[in-house]
């Protein structure tokens, strides 16, 4: 019990600094055994307020389609077919504000925002419909081509069927948040 015992004395049981409530909220653990997901997080006033402020702030910003003139300057392209979709009404069910607010909410909660691009027989874009980010996966096929896999549910219009739908990149508007692989955003 001499000199070395003072250096190598036993210590109390180490404490885990990750047991705090802030850590559990941010990283998912909880003493109650309930997991925190996007929907349950939105039931917290602080999360709801932050998401609402950010999504509404983005949705209220003016959005226009521009074209270059012969002189090299830009002007609003009000007659462009995409102008109405982006500025006024992306689909018959929602305004541009609601569409952009929805996509921003998905981006904040899931790290990605997706919309299906609907085209007519000529290939012209006629509508944009938001898709639930938690039911979308992005992958590559055997040849390295990107594809999107969306899990349909009974409530999805217009098919009202369950199942998986494969979408080409040209049929999906994908807005990723910051991520690690360049394909999908990291879910916060």
Question: Where are the predicted features?
Answer:
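Structured, contiguous alpha/beta core segments that scaffold functional sites
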Residues: 1-188
């Amino acid at each position: 019990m001499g000199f070395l015992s003072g250096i190598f004395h036993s210590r109390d049981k180490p404490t885990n600094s990750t047991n705090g409530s802030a850590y559990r909220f941010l990283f998912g653990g909880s003493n109650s055994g309930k997991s925190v997901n996007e929907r349950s997080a939105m039931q917290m006033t602080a999360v709801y307020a932050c998401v609402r402020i950010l999504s509404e702030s983005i949705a209220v910003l003016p959005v226009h389609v521009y074209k270059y003139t012969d002189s090299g300057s830009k002007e609003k392209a009000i007659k462009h077919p995409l102008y109405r979709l982006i500025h006024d009404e992306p689909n018959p069910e929602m305004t541009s504000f609601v569409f952009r607010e929805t996509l921003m909410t998905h981006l904040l909660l899931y790290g990605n925002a997706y919309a299906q691009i609907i085209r007519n027989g000529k290939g012209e874009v006629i509508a944009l419909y938001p898709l639930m980010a938690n039911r979308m996966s992005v992958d590559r096929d055997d040849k390295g081509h990107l594809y999107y896999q969306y899990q349909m549910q009974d409530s999805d219009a217009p098919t009202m069927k369950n199942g998986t739908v494969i979408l080409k990149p040209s049929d999906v508007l994908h807005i990723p948040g910051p991520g690690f692989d360049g394909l999908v955003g990291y879910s916060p």
